[in-house]
């Protein structure tokens, strides 16, 4: 029933993915060997969304792991849940992409992509009714960004009617790992705009801020950051895996969140986030969750929702709570902050309630918002891209692998178009929308 196939690519994607499977295993009561050791039938009822049951009663994740170098794969394999994955589903090259997206998209990645697609096909054939794919990758490196988007476009050709959800780690504004991040990110966004259905935007700096400010961690590690991401990932699909009062799936999510097909880049947030020290001083209530969930400091990407307006948003609550209270709180948010929502989409906040809370919590909520302020993120990457591209800096690394300068120009203009589309809908008012329609009708009559 409604399976989701999980794909992780590159170093970042594999590290997030490894953490994600730890979280999902804990929720379904599955131990590191793939055996079930939980205490509730609900954990097994829809375990097949993310797991395949093998003949000996082991649960095997529906996951495909790919990378262009064996390093990260080895660390996943030797990690706590390394033996749960099917050994054939590790697909890796030897040379690495070296942060060069031309290698990941055209040379090294293109050689490996067929074997990845074979594994994806095998997994998809095992599914009863495949709902879609979720891809974890970063956009700054070479493998996750370029080979990830190459795989997405290939899967798009083969499974055009299945949902494609991505968790994409964008380059951070101040923290940068590599100098060519703006190139790789722009080339990837160019692909994601066309081929992905829903794109959850994350970035390390915002996650670090949450760890410092909210969780009061003095030295956050990537493990802590990935834990935040995996809590959100698990929240997005909880309705598929556990019974709830108001269910949603990937397609319902897309229909409720995407007013225009190109604008499918979402901000995500998670509540409750509290530091270990102050946990016992906080009551977990629906108002408290709602307040924290809509807080700008809680967003996992470096864009401030107060600088733009929400086109749509979706809140997924988990735990035993009254739906009436959830609806009241959501209405309350919309009424108090009406200037932050566009007025030409009525009822633009969807809420979902799932009865089973995450492991170790009484209640939790996941937030997904389609806000025009995400353009800050694209604009920032675009400025960095232009600064380097104007001088053709580092370009020989890409053209040497067979890329053309025109591709860069195309990707740049696509990114700039995206920014101006977000800006256009941020400025639009209800009256203008009416005028557009009148003009269009006038044109038709002519």
Curated annotation (Swiss-Prot):
* Alphabetical UniProt keywords: Cytoplasm, Cytoskeleton, GTP-binding, Magnesium, Metal-binding, Microtubule, Nucleotide-binding
Task: Name where it mostly resides.
Answer: cytoplasm
A Pfam family name for this chain?
Answer: Tubulin_C
- Residue ranges spanning the membrane: these are none
Tissue-level expression = Found in areas of rapidly dividing tissues.
- Comp. bias regions, Acidic residues: 429-446
Where is it found, in Gene Ontology cellular component terms? cytoplasm; microtubule
Residues binding Mg(2+) are 69
Record protein name field = Tubulin beta-1 chain
Give the organism the record lists: Zea mays
Q: Write the gene name.
A: TUBB1
């Amino acid at each position: 029933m409604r399976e989701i196939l999980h794909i992780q690519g590159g170093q970042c994607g594999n590290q997030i993915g490894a953490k994600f499977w730890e979280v999902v295993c804990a929720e379904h009561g599955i131990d590191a060997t793939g055996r079930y050791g939980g205490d509730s039938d609900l954990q097994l009822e829809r375990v097949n969304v993310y797991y395949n049951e093998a003949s000996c009663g082991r649960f095997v994740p529906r996951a495909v792991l790919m990378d262009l170098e064996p390093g990260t794969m080895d660390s996943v394999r030797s990690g706590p849940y390394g033996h749960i994955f099917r050994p054939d589903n590790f697909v890796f090259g030897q040379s690495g992409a070296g942060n060069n997206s031309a290698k990941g998209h055209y040379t090294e990645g293109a050689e490996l992509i067929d074997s990845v697609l074979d594994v994806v096909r095998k997994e998809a054939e095992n599914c009863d009714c495949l709902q879609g794919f979720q891809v974890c990758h970063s956009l700054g490196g070479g493998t996750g960004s370029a080979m990830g988007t190459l795989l997405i476009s290939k899967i798009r050709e083969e499974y055009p009617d299945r949902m494609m959800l991505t968790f994409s780690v964008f380059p951070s504004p101040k923290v940068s790992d590599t100098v060519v991040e703006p190139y790789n990110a722009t080339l990837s966004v160019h692909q994601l705009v066309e081929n992905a259905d829903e794109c959850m935007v994350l970035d390390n700096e915002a996650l670090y801020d949450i760890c410092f400010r909210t969780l009061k961690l003095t030295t956050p590690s990537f493990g802590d950051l990935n834990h935040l991401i995996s809590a959100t990932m698990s929240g997005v699909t909880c309705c598929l895996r556990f019974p709830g009062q108001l269910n949603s799936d990937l397609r319902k999510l897309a229909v409720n969140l995407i007013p225009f097909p190109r604008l499918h880049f979402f901000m995500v947030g998670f509540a409750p986030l509290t530091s270990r020290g102050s946990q016992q001083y906080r009551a977990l209530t629906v108002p408290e969750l709602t307040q924290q969930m809509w807080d700008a400091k809680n967003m996992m990407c470096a864009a401030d929702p107060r600088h733009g307006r929400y086109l749509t948003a979706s809140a997924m609550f988990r735990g035993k709570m009254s739906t009436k209270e959830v609806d009241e709180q959501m209405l309350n948010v919309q009424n108090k902050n009406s200037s932050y929502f566009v007025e030409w989409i009525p009822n633009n906040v969807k809420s979902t309630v799932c009865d089973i809370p995450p492991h170790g919590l009484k209640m939790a909520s996941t937030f997904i918002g389609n806000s025009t302020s995400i353009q800050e993120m694209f604009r920032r990457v675009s400025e960095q891209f232009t600064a380097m591209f104007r001088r053709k800096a580092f370009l020989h690394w890409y053209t040497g692998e067979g890329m053309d300068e025109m591709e860069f120009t195309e990707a740049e203009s696509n990114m700039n178009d995206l920014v101006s589309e977000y800006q256009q809908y941020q400025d639009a008012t209800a009256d203008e929308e009416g005028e557009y329609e009148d003009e269009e009708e006038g044109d038709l009559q002519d």
